[in-house]
């Protein structure tokens, strides 16, 4: 019985360990210099993007995004989780349920699915955004009610937020 249980555990753990490797079985190379940037209708025009890998309309993808200084993507959430890896510039990511995070060149942040946040590019930003599912964006008002991008861009009221917990840039890793 013990042998059967141990064998089952080994098989299950091996399957879990191999799943990410099997998810992408082709090498991908996307030189930034050759990226073709364009606007996306659901993102303010101050942000442009280029797909580095995958198809963001269908599933997991890596997107290269450039934003101008002062660009704000108002309060929103995504159905998929996302990871941001900063290449250049700096930004502030406000969190509905936490302290704002200041991002700088070389920084990384993981945002789980449906995490309500707002992105402000403090100095011209370039970063990679990796999603674990199809890309979408749901803008919300200060009470968390879903609204259009135009309404979100016009809104001036701050989001009702949880108490600040400190700036993550000061954390030791």
Q: What kind of region is each of these model predictions?
A:
Residues 73-75, 93-94, 111, 116-122:
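Short beta-strand His + acidic residue motifs that chelate non-heme Fe in jelly-roll/DSBH
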Residues 68-71, 78-97:
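Glycine- and acidic-residue-biased ligand/ion/polar-headgroup-sensing regions
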Residues 58-78, 110-113:
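Conserved short histidine dyad/triad with adjacent acidic residue
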Residues 104, 113-137:
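Ligand-binding loop in jelly-roll beta-barrel domains
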Residues 55-57, 91, 96-114:
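Short acidic-glycine-tyrosine-enriched beta hairpin
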Residues 21-61, 144-173:
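A short, N-terminal "cap"/entry segment at the start of jelly-roll beta-barrel domains
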Residues 1-4:
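Positively charged n-region of N-terminal signal peptides that target proteins for export
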